[in-house]
Amino acid sequence: ILQDKKPIAIRVPSNGVVHTTEKVDEEYSYESKYKVMHKGSEVAIIAAGSFYQKGENVVRLLADKGIDATLINPRYLNEVDADTLEALKTNHNLVVTLEDGCKDGGFGERIASYYGTSDMKVLVCGVKKGLYDRYNVEQLLKDNRLLDEQIVEDVLALI
């Protein structure tokens, strides 16, 4: 990592280490710029943090249904990338946000708020607000419609 102007944090992935052939960013001056990993149309998946692999899975499942969805890695969650979000308006009807945290006041709601006065539909996928202690992860995902297949069902119902 070549960035030496600001603090950094290296996170240990909670969902395991996944091999990728994607080039690793060495420089981080793009703070509020999202990275479009795959450019499609009609549906855009913005998958944050440990839910990025879930985003890849959802895009793959949508492709099996004939939908070439855009996949975006937001990289930073503190600000919206207005340029990228505006560009999606040209050939997308639905933006889906995936986050492994609480939806209330989270990243997805920020994206929904950005599109509030436009015709863009936004599906915010995250965990409902609550106190979760000693829970089964699969059951929590299922209860919040966060299983890959459930997300695809919800997308298909909206387009």
Walk through the language-model features, giving the residues of each:
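Thiamine diphosphate
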Residues: 2-159
